[in-house]
């Protein structure tokens, strides 16, 4: 698979003294079960610009309606765009390099298009961003039904994929940063979905890459609301997700996480994530909604906040 890029993040820039002190304390705890980052490749993180000519590409695109609470609706692409953003960015490449780049792009496109029909996750390569996961709708329903104030809020959607929860926030006045593991998901799915729903592109940013490097890239940036759904299937990634939430949630902010209570067969789920939060003792977690609709295993929406010292 050709989904690894040589972008580097200066780790020295992430020099929050409090975080270093907390990390030193946490290093004394046995949380190896929740942190397998050393055992797999991790995609570096970077900000993603808006795709070239995106508006014109959307003129003949096929969309479908996703319905949530009280018959409210959002749009999404029926299928992600095909092709690679790099194909649109070769104007400043000399002819010899162009031949090499075209060969690389062809290989990238073949690998990318194999993933469009992929239903399984490939750790370190593809994290399921092209699929619309049911818990993302659970989050939208919760935000709508509980009338969560979104106007002017800074929002981070972790593992966004289609980006519908973030788009809902964007349409309700938030400033949203969308994050997904694969930049191909951002270019070919998230950004198009933002535009077809009429989202303000000037109030949206996009980041790709592994959570470890996203944490570093964001430096000391804080968010009023953090959203994430169906991201608890891999216990070995829990510590990175925990760090991302803990380091970037405003002191009085709230994280809404939607997940299955248990992911049978893989060991993940909300109960397991609660174990890590209890060990590290920096965040509080409470269930704010149970979903037992018979469509899948029991699902929950939980609210995560900073503990009051």
UniProtKB/Swiss-Prot annotation:
One of its GO terms (molecular function) is protein-L-histidine N-tele-methyltransferase activity. Residues 1-37, 79-111 are annotated as: Disordered. Keywords: Cytoplasm, Methyltransferase, Nucleus, S-adenosyl-L-methionine, Transferase. Residues 84-109 have a biased composition (Low complexity). Pfam families: Methyltransf_16. Its main location: cytoplasm. This is Histidine protein methyltransferase 1 homolog.
